[in-house]
């Protein structure tokens, strides 16, 4: 018996170990997959390739060439978040991206990488973001503190946004599914609730991609801000 709705977001254990460890091992094993040129192309792989090319052009078109080396990393992050969001919608599965610890583990290194790139390649330009041009000297100390705080909380905003949206959607689906079970004796209400459930599921499919896209897009904006 489930004691709380949030029990579904607790990390499950397998043989006494957190399932997150096994997921990390499986992801690391993908590094040993042979080159795509050795694999047989099918419709699914061609569709995935077209999708990745389109998203790469969409995200990196406004970014200077010096930041194009981030394309592989950010596209991998997008697909990782998107596939985990989709997998979490399946019955009896664990939603990895509902864990703030995982989302922060992705957000902090990416954000820190953009900061380090800006600080090493153009330190004066990066520091100039802390004080807008034309600011009165009396307001300069306050604006520097405010801008510094806004930059520091960026990874927290990335992680919390993804966690909150995925968690809220799964809770709504869980509540509607409980209503379906309790309304089996009333066919009109059952049909209405089932229609709401299907619409909500379609919405969550869209949210799964939107949240992955927003996460990567925001990181690309941070990257663009620190490029020469």
Curated annotation (Swiss-Prot):
It comes from the Eukaryota. CDD domains: ATP-synt_Fo_a_6. Subunit a, of the mitochondrial membrane ATP synthase complex (F(1)F(0) ATP synthase or Complex V) that produces ATP from ADP in the presence of a proton gradient across the membrane which is generated by electron transport complexes of the respiratory chain. ATP synthase complex consist of a soluble F(1) head domain - the catalytic core - and a membrane F(1) domain - the membrane proton channel. These two domains are linked by a central stalk rotating inside the F(1) region and a stationary peripheral stalk. GO terms for cellular component: mitochondrial inner membrane; proton-transporting ATP synthase complex. Its main location: mitochondrion. PANTHER family: ATP SYNTHASE SUBUNIT A. It is found in: Mitochondrion inner membrane. One of its GO terms (biological process) is proton transmembrane transport. It comes from Myxine glutinosa. Belongs to the ATPase A chain family. It catalyses: H(+)(in) = H(+)(out). Component of the ATP synthase complex composed at least of ATP5F1A/subunit alpha, ATP5F1B/subunit beta, ATP5MC1/subunit c (homooctomer), MT-ATP6/subunit a, MT-ATP8/subunit 8, ATP5ME/subunit e, ATP5MF/subunit f, ATP5MG/subunit g, ATP5MK/subunit k, ATP5MJ/subunit j, ATP5F1C/subunit gamma, ATP5F1D/subunit delta, ATP5F1E/subunit epsilon, ATP5PF/subunit F6, ATP5PB/subunit b, ATP5PD/subunit d, ATP5PO/subunit OSCP. It holds the Pfam family ATP-synt_A. The chain crosses the membrane at residues 13-33, 70-90, 100-120, 140-160, 162-182, 190-210. It is a multi-pass membrane protein. This is ATP synthase F(0) complex subunit a.
